[in-house]
Design a protein with these regions (language model features):
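A short, sequence-level motif marking secondary-structure junctions
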Residues: 11, 52-53, 63-68
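Intrinsically disordered, low-complexity regions of eukaryotic proteins
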Residues: 14, 39, 51-53, 90, ...
Length: 120
């Protein structure tokens, strides 16, 4: 029984190993939509968000691992959702926060399973 559990954990680990390509493929729709920019620099990937009103970049994040890239894109996506769901500039309600967190958690799982985002 112990061997089976260890094998399953090993197998889950192998499946869930992320690569930069997996993350970029998973979030291609978010990147193409302009939620964030992802650039490959000589130091690695960078995720940048654009503030249209201020006309400047903000939240520039260096991502040295695929997991860091996934989290930076998810953070930008959460910010996008917050702006989309909360149109009257109030602080998010607990329900709105839960909705954003659930969508983000679902996308994290999708990315870990090498899936692809199909809806913003």
């Amino acid at each position: 029984r112990m061997i089976i559990v260890l094998y399953i954990r090993y197998f889950e680990r192998k499946i869930s190993m992320l690569s930069f390509e997996n993350v970029l493929d998973c979030f291609a729709l978010a990147i193409q939509t302009g939620i964030c920019e992802v650039l490959l620099t000589r130091h690695g990937y960078v995720v940048m968000e654009w503030d249209e009103e201020e006309r400047e970049w903000f939240n520039v994040t260096h991502c040295d691992t695929p997991a860091a890239l996934r989290e930076a894109i998810l953070s930008a996506y959460e910010g996008y959702l917050q702006l989309s769901l909360i149109t009257d500039c109030h602080n998010p309600t607990e329900e709105e926060i839960r909705t954003i967190q659930k969508r983000s958690a679902d996308l994290r799982l999708l990315c870990n399973a090498h899936g692809k985002m199909t809806v913003i």
